[in-house]
């Protein structure tokens, strides 16, 4: 199943270590098609979004950096707005960083949509206050063609109203242990789901 994600961040009270001397922290919004990638995080024997972005940085300014993201998407998962931070030489303007990274990322299906100087203490992962996810299901007899790889095709119809009613049981704070992978690195399986909507996109 394909999953679209958006990582959203905003500043918390906590302050995290900043960049080294001569570097500045750049906050960026990254969009990618994760079909051919093992996920966000670097892997030893498979391409990842993180590795591809870090290699683009090295090609741009010669630095080996660690790209930090608001969330770690899994294999095959896309993002329309992953929040990332990079510590880069401070003399580069945000526009220069965006243009250079996009040039070095081509032809990979990864694009830097926006770049700005991060506020002091900002950290893409630990300053995140929420994350949003979009799951798309194509419900029809004919298989997916234009959206292949971006939807979960199911050749039956659904009762959307019943699905929405059932989804409400997941809203709130719950222990999601049965949903987490064996290698999950989250400190706690207890999470708060603020909103869950099941909607028919079109008929």
Report residues per predicted region.
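Structured-RNA-binding interfaces characteristic of tRNA pseudouridine synthases
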Residues: 2-203
């Amino acid at each position: 199943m394909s999953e679209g994600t958006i990582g959203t961040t905003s500043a918390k009270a906590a302050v995290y270590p900043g960049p080294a001397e001569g570097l500045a922290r750049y906050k960026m919004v990254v969009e990618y098609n994760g079909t051919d990638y093992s996920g966000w995080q670097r892997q030893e024997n498979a391409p990842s979004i993180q590795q591809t972005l870090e290699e683009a940085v090295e090609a741009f300014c010669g630095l080996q950096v660690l790209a930090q993201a608001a969330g770690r998407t899994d294999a095959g998962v896309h993002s329309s707005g992953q929040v990332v931070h990079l510590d880069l030489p401070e003399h580069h303007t945000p526009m220069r960083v965006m243009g250079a990274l996009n040039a070095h990322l081509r032809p990979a299906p990864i694009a830097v949509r926006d770049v700005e100087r991060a506020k002091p203490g900002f950290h893409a992962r630990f300053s995140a206050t929420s994350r949003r996810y979009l799951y798309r299901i194509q419900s029809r007899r004919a298989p997916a063609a234009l959206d292949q790889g971006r939807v979960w095709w199911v050749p039956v119809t659904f009762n959307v109203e019943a699905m929405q009613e059932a989804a409400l049981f997941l809203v709130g704070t719950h222990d999601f242990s049965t949903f987490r992978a064996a290698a999950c690195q989250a400190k706690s399986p207890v999470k708060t789901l603020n909103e869950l909507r099941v909607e028919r996109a079109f008929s």
